[in-house]
Design a protein with these regions (language model features):
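Q-loop/switch helix immediately C-terminal to the Walker
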Residues: 75-87, 95
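Conserved ABC ATPase "signature" region
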Residues: 93-109
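Conserved ABC ATPase signature
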Residues: 113-117, 121
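Hydrophobic anchor residue at the start of the ABC signature
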Residues: 127
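Catalytic Walker B motif of ABC-type/P-loop ATPase nucleotide-binding domains
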Residues: 138-142
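Helix N-cap at the start of a conserved alpha-helix in ABC-type nucleotide-binding domains
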Residues: 149-151
Length: 194
């Protein structure tokens, strides 16, 4: 179980959030307006930033989708996903291609280097890479950015299918994404804004 205990983050004298406490053992949506600190909170959970006060327990191995896609631009979609897997690409290729079809990426797009994909296609690659990575906790920062409504529905369905019973924190302020997922919503601004 992921535990946030009295987590505080401030930049200079200005607190971003204060005394945030939460336990997560299943998928949840972290909702707050832009600028509240959702990305900073996820960065703390990933170990990329330190909180000003408080502690985090039970994160374990993390897989993440950042706001920036962080793909290897010269590799194609399947190769970007297999980077996080043991063994050879051929071992997983068919299953990964099936997942890409499920979220609306055709065979032609799968052959392109990541640098030639659209923004929405890059998000799908980043999302599948996180889903395929061996992890204890999944952290997703606005994972549906650049996706059309149909693709968002498909991606949300795949997340619902794959993430049951695992700590998943999906940060967004997109109401359509929240509806598509149907996960419990944690309104961060009501919990930890001073």
């Amino acid at each position: 179980m992921l535990k946030l205990q009295h987590l505080t983050k401030q930049f200079g004298a200005a607190p971003l959030f204060t005394d945030l406490c939460m336990e997560v053992d299943a998928p949840v949506v972290l909702w707050a307006p832009s600028g509240w600190g959702k990305t900073t909170l996820l960065r703390i959970l990933m170990g990329l930033e330190r909180p000003t006060a408080g502690s985090v327990e039970g994160v374990g191995r993390v897989a993440a989708v950042f706001q920036e896609d962080r793909l290897c631009p010269q590799l194609n979609a399947v190769q970007n996903v297999t980077l996080v897997l043991p063994g050879t690409e051929n071992q997983y290729k068919e299953q990964i291609e099936c997942d890409f079809q499920q979220i609306g990426m055709d065979a032609a797009a799968l052959q392109l280097p990541a640098r030639r994909l659209s923004g929405g296609q890059k998000r799908r690659v980043a999302l599948l890479r996180a889903l395929w990575a061996s992890s204890d906790t999944l952290l997703l920062d606005e994972p549906f950015t650049g996706m059309d409504p149909d693709t968002l529905q498909r991606a949300a369905a795949l997340l619902r299918q794959r993430c049951a019973g695992k700590p998943v924190l999906l940060a967004t302020h997109d109401e359509s994404a929240i509806r598509a997922l149907g996960w419990p919503v944690v309104e961060l601004e009501k919990m930890g804004r001073s």
